[in-house]
Every structure is written in structure tokens, then in C-alpha cells.
Curated annotation (Swiss-Prot):
It is a single-pass membrane protein. This is Tripartite motif-containing protein 59. Keywords: Coiled coil, Endoplasmic reticulum, Membrane, Metal-binding, Transmembrane, Transmembrane helix, Zinc, Zinc-finger. Interacts with ECSIT. It comes from Gallus gallus. It comes from the Eukaryota. GO terms for biological process: innate immune response; negative regulation of canonical NF-kappaB signal transduction. A zinc finger (B box-type) spans 92-134. The gene is TRIM59. GO terms for cellular component: endoplasmic reticulum; endoplasmic reticulum membrane. The chain crosses the membrane at residues 333-353. Pfam families: zf-B_box, zf-RING_UBOX. Residues 163-247 form a coiled coil.
Amino acid sequence: MHQFEEELTCSICYSLFEDPRVLPCSHTFCRSCLEGVIQLSSNFSIWRPLRVPLKCPNCRSIVEIPASGTESLPINFALKAIIEKYRQEDHSDVATCSEHYRQPLNVYCLLDKKLVCGHCLTIGKHNGHPIDDLHSAYLKEKESSGKILEQLTDKHWSDVCLLIEKLKEQKAQCESIVQDDKKVVVQYFKKLSETLEHKKQVLLAALDEINRQILEEYEPHIEKLKKIREEQLELMSLNTSIQKEESPLVFLEKVDNVHQRIKALKEKELPDVKPVEVYPRVGHLLKDVWSKTEIGQINKILTPKIKLVPKRKLHSKNSEKERGKPEELLQAANPLSVTFIFTVIIAIAVLSFHKPISSVVIESIPTHISDFFGFLYQDFCTCMQNTVDVVCHKLNSLAEFLGGIVPF
């Protein structure tokens, strides 16, 4: 607090003097503060004298206050004038209370550890709290600054530093793990994408090849029939022109020529068109095999050899509906094919165990036998898948039945 401001502060309320009155001992106090002291003293007195004795709060000397009270005490006009002038001046360097207008913060509250004004102590929320003057509080806190430094440099803060380093290390480890996992994910899906792209190109190449075979199969027949059709149209046009011929000799010669050409044209052998189909169907393969294969096993799926084969006859008109029934699918399985394939697999396994089969032997197998095995393999896979579906369906039905009887 400014030294000049301290001289203008009441020692009872620690605020700027309000209506300053002078005691006989020459000490000045606020009139309201003196009335409070007199009221407190009169509460302990059993009689009311003509003059009220009062102990000065500063010098502790006994002074007498007239019976009329503090109103009869002289006003310190000089001090009052100085205070009024002081209040009119700008004191931006002096801290003032935020709750009490223009009251300086000139007292230190020991309970709340903060600066307060005189009104805070008398009528505010700090009333009755232990206090100290600013200079004394400053000296005490200055002496305890060493303890503050000790509190800020004890083992607790070393533990905080160690914990920070430990957390940073754990954070770095976790981030490293995440980065490694990211690399694994990228590599995994890159490899998976390459595998799928390779399988895609292989299947598309196989379909392009079968498309070429389709052209070779049908295009010659179509061209041959087109020529026959063109010759037919030519003969029809020739016949129309002959009908306009008026010379009997010329007409007969031309008609005979037309008959011979028609006979020769009709005697030409027409191509024997047998219904064929593409087998196996890639769409069915993707649906029945690929969609049920684990991702990691896709690279192990064999690419089928797509061919044009004679179209198989349907056993009934509702064969497509019957294929959807698990029981009839199971009955449709060819026991002879399954037995034959199992026998071949066992024989190959025995021969491989006894003596590895050389690549020369494998390559010496005729092409038609290899195709036959491929055809049987596709049928076998389809039959086995149908069998598994039926078994799973039966097991699920049994589990639902038992679940309704015996609670799990």
C-alpha cells in the first residue's frame, strides 16, 4: 500500500476515513467506527454515566466521550479535505477492491490468503477473519519462500518426470506397434489384391479362349449356310426372270438348269449342329466355391479348364427347382464317380509315399485322360459341397429340435 494512502486509512476499519472525528488524545477515527466501539463498551456497563469512558484503539489511553455521543467530537476537517481531494485524483497504480468501489486492498486475510479492503472486513464476507497488514504479511511470506522452493524440488516432482518419460516410452511403443500393423495391413491387402487380380486375369483369359473356340466351332458352319442361302436367293431371282422368257427353247433350257442347281444345292450336306454348353460355368464356380473359400486360401484355388461340352439332358422340367432341395441333391450324387475319384486319390498317395511320381510320367498322361479327370473333379467338388450343405442343414434342424426340449 502507498505510504500516503496508509496515513488516510482508519486503523479500525482499514478503509479511507469516513467522517473523521478526533478523540481528546488527538487520534482520528471514523465516526461509525467509534460508535461501534462505544456500543460494544456500553453493552458491558450496568449504568449510564453523563460521560462515556473509551479506550483509544491506538494509544490505549482512557478518554471521555460526552453523553451526546460522537456527534459532539470535533471533525478533522484537514484530513477530510485531503481524503476528498485524494479520491478525486486518479490512482491507477493502487489496487482497489472489486466488490467495494474505490476501496484500496490494504489488508491481508490470513484465512483466505488474499488481499481485502476494510469494507470486506467489516461488512463483507471476510468479517471476523484473522488479518495482518501488508508489510508484515509480505515479510512472513518472503521468509517462507525457501520452503516453497523445497516443495517444488522434492521427490514428488522427480516421480512426475519419471512418469512422463515412462508414458512417452509406452506411447512410442504403442505408436510403433500401430505403424507395424499398418504395414502388415498394406502388405496383406496388396498381396491379396495381386492374387485376386491374377485370378481375374486367368479367368478372363480362359473365357477369351473359350470364346475363340466358340468362333471356331460355329463360324465355319454359319458361313457355309450363308453361302447356301445366298445361292437360294440367287435361284429365286433367276426363276423370276425365267418366267418372263417367251422363247420356249430358251425357257426350257434355263428351267432345266435351275432344276439341276436346286437339286445340287439341296444335296449339299448340312452341318450336324449338336447342342453344346460352356462347362464349367464361371459364375457358378465363383458362387459355389470362391464365395465359400477363406481369404487366405484363394491363391490355392485351381483355375478350371473351361470347354465346350455336349449339352447335358435335363432329367425333368423341374430340375432347376429340384436342385434347390438338399435331399434330392444328395441323391443326385454319383456314387460311382465319388468312389472312383477316392480310389485314384488313394493310389496316387500310396505311389507318392512309396516313390515320388516324376514329372515325365505326369506329362505322359494323354490329354483326354487329363480332361476326364478334370470333369470328374468338378462333379466331385459339386457333390461334396452339396453333401456338406445337407449335413449342416440336418445338424441345424437337430439342434433346434433339441433346444426346444432340453434348455442349454
